[in-house]
Amino acid sequence: MTITPQHLIALLPLLIVGLTVVVVMLSIAWRRNHFLNATLSVIGLNAALVSLWFVGQAGAMDVTPLMRVDGFAMLYTGLVLLASLATCTFAYPWLEGYNDNQEEFYLLVLIASLGGILLANANHLAALFLGIELISLPLFGLIGYAFRQKRSLEASIKYTILSAAASSFLLFGMALVYAQSGNLSFEALGKSLGDGMLHEPLLLAGFGLMIVGLGFKLSLVPFHLWTPDVYQGAPAPVSTFLATASKIAIFGVVMRLFLYAPVGDSEAVRVVLGIIAFASIIFGNLMALSQTNIKRLLGYSSISHLGYLLVALIALQSGEMSMEAVGVYLAGYLFSSLGAFGVVSLMSSPFRGPDADSLYSYRGLFWHRPVLAAVMTVMMLSLAGIPMTLGFIGKFYVLAVGVQASLWWLVAAVVVGSAIGLYYYLRVAVSLYLHAPQQPGRDAPTNWQYSAGGIVVLISALLVLVLGVWPQPLISLVQLATPLM
């Protein structure tokens, strides 16, 4: 095939982030300078975000048989880039106190972002696998970045071994799907699956193995066992990336696969996904109830959030609103998670050993950092799905989609899960306003709101509130992000 200037414009975000990786590599080789490499990374990610406007002007197209650039890909690419940008911003003050190599952190985040962009544009099972590996491999290093901390190293080893096992399941599943259908492209799969082939045992086994692999990456029950330990052990900025960029990119590509190849038409697949969604919602929320570590709590809550999203995925064949629901929910989840993990990062910076992730560290925060406590409260209310926040709009969409598709037992699970979630989110929010302990632990810097990380956290809180009251701009944006059929 011939690569035209139009194709290059369509690939701009991928090319810009790739070029930034090379520039940062050369910069590290030439001279170690933490500020320079952090600045180069942030400039590259901002340039990639700006380039999405030019991609939109170029229109939707298939760049290669592996990649399709359309409104859907642009939305998910934008969300991944925002999460990567926030991760780099939170990491800078944290790394200031880190005595080992600081610069490689940005390199790993950029390479993982490349994987996220590839996943957002993937239109082929080979691109899906390449993207997942490209986002997972840098995470092995990022999770164990504070390798002198026992928990960080343990989390990295745990994630590496389990991730390798999940990837092998995913690859074997793809092989079985290919053996039965003879296709790897999403669209070609859709055409071949339309002939009553969905009942073939080999194909169902292939999709079953793929669900195991993807379920691990999305930390769905029962493939979730790594999640709380890894969230707790990883440095706070890495937990931010893990909770947002990697989940959004992988869910985006699964959404596209289900859209083109009507896998959800199979009753067996729908039942299995329904059970996984139900278990993720209930188990994730119940396990979060007893947590006293805020990163573990957010880890368990992310399991339940992916369960809510799975309800919209199961309802995908029932109506157009499912895609809108997923887009709005993921945007709300992104900003709420960035704010919550951003507060933990600010409290844990600069690096001084373990993060400030104990709930006790946040007790009475309001009395000496009132704005930071207010931001954390807004994020907890949004994650709980309280009205006037963006989280409520997303949860309302999911419930509407579930009702539209007559998934009554999953709608009941969402309602019960939200009620349980309200308890532990409010427990975090209330502890911020209790009497401060006699010997306060870690604290955010006095001028935190003037730092780049502080600005990101404040913008996230503002977006959660403004879009919670007036969600139309976000809904219009998500409606524009339609995939090329």
UniProtKB/Swiss-Prot annotation:
It is an enzyme of class 7 (translocase). GO terms for molecular function: NADH dehydrogenase (ubiquinone) activity; NADH:ubiquinone reductase (non-electrogenic) activity; quinone binding. Its EC number is 7.1.1.-. It catalyses: a quinone + NADH + 5 H(+)(in) = a quinol + NAD(+) + 4 H(+)(out). It is a multi-pass membrane protein. One of its GO terms (biological process) is ATP synthesis coupled electron transport. Its main location: membrane. GO terms for cellular component: plasma membrane. It comes from the Bacteria. Pfam families: Proton_antipo_M. PANTHER family: NADH DEHYDROGENASE (PTHR22773). Belongs to the complex I subunit 2 family. NDH-1 is composed of 13 different subunits. Subunits NuoA, H, J, K, L, M, N constitute the membrane sector of the complex. This is NADH-quinone oxidoreductase subunit N. The gene is nuoN.
